[in-house]
Amino acid sequence: MTLLATHAPATTPGLRIERLGPALGAVIHGIDLTSIDEIAAFDIRRALLAHKVLFFRDQHGFDDDAQVRLGNLLGDLTPGHPVAGNHERREIYNIDSSDPEFSFSDVWHTDVTFMKRPPAISILRAVTLPPYGGDTSWADSQAAYDSLSAPFKALADQLLAVHDGNREWGAFLKKNGGHEWEGEIVTELPAVEHPVVRVHPETGRRGLFVNPGFTSHVSGVSEAESRAVLDALYAHLTQPEHTIRHRWAPGDVGIWDNRATSHYANRDYTNTRVMHRVTVRGDEPRGVDGLRAQ
């Protein structure tokens, strides 16, 4: 896919961006996601690079077909999930709290970083909502990196970290088997390395690319050093100044840049909560000066 920076600006009539914070989060008005064209999709991607998390309200006609269509306009869709999968549409990950094997997302994480090429973009649609609770928060990994001290940036820039999906999905995979991902059926989840600081492939900005959900340790250092570095980065990443919180309403759709954010879904409800997610294919994370897993 051609980088957005090489495109001339485009404008969708009626589109209005309502910022939610200095750098993170925006509500997009004036777009019906059920009938967008390539120009509107370009504008969404451009807004996503600037604001990292976008919300669209009152999209009541936005169904599974429309969600898949939107995803394909934004890039190439992945299958719904490399391990979990209980929806008739292969592109959709059905997140249903009534499923006895449902995995709660009440830990800060970035989607599917335990694979070599995590998704670039995630699109989440509210299907069934509890009367209260179930909010989602996002953290801005680029703002978090920018606000680190220079010595800590220099340290983080040269580190690799291991991401391991077995802690969350290993037992599920062993019991149920995996699904297609990157053209192959997933039968095991070997740990992968990613740079601790990721350089965004479209903007060139640096951001922290570790998360408590899937990052197990920093490579090449002692366990104590790894724990100290990760704990410090997690605490810094999730400071209130780097986060926003969204209370879902019927008809809401959220889109986020999975290369520049982490998120957390509150586990504070007892009624059923169902969300449908699709993800746009990403690339292999690269760090500062091209740092990558060996």
Residue ranges of predicted features:
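Non-heme Fe(II) oxygenase catalytic core, chiefly the N-lobe of the double-stranded beta-helix
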Residues: 2-253, 258-294
